[in-house]
Amino acid sequence: MIIGIGNDIIDIRRVQKTLDRFGDRFIERIFTEVEKAKSEGRRMRAASYAKRFAAKEACSKALGTGMRRGVFWKDMGVVNLRGGQPTMALTGGALERLKEMTPEGTEAVIHLTITDDHPQAQAFVIISVVPKP
């Protein structure tokens, strides 16, 4: 059963301008250590950060909160499953909100797709629940 859907699209050039203007201040405020390690190693650094930014926005929409009600940027981070598939790791207020949304006897699964085609990056998040084993 789907309990949340969110999407976001962002202009990579806007992220590049933000990186140029604010640099580490922007990165440290928004991104997790895992996200920074992934993005800093990429040739298309701004596109990598843009996809992750869009994923956070999409996830906050799927949670039904946006960036409020105790949900902060670093509470959500893009991580990869063993096979390489992206998903979101939640902590803090984002994790608390997910727990509130999840019906008893079920567990939440976060599906994420991220893509970029210059000048845009996009993310789509679906939060579903499945019965606990």
Curated annotation (Swiss-Prot):
Any one GO BP annotation for this protein: fatty acid biosynthetic process
UniProt GO cellular component terms: cytoplasm
Cofactor(s) named in the record: Mg(2+)
Keywords for this protein: Cytoplasm, Fatty acid biosynthesis, Fatty acid metabolism, Lipid biosynthesis, Lipid metabolism, Magnesium, Metal-binding, Transferase
This protein's record includes keyword Metal-binding: yes
Reaction(s) the record says it catalyses: apo-[ACP] + CoA = holo-[ACP] + adenosine 3',5'-bisphosphate + H(+)
Chief subcellular location: cytoplasm
Binding-site list for Mg(2+): D8, E57
Keyword check for Magnesium: yes
EC number(s) per entry: 2.7.8.7
Protein origin, superkingdom: Bacteria
Localization of this protein: Cytoplasm
Molecular function, one GO term: holo-[acyl-carrier-protein] synthase activity
Pfam families, alphabetized: ACPS
Family to which this protein belongs: Belongs to the P-Pant transferase superfamily. AcpS family.
Primary role: Transfers the 4'-phosphopantetheine moiety from coenzyme A to a Ser of acyl-carrier-protein.
NCBIfam families for the chain: acpS, pantethn_trn
Protein name: Holo-[acyl-carrier-protein] synthase
Species the sequence originates in: Parvibaculum lavamentivorans (strain DS-1 / DSM 13023 / NCIMB 13966)
Lineage: Bacteria, Pseudomonadati, Pseudomonadota, Alphaproteobacteria, Hyphomicrobiales
Gene that specifies this protein: acpS
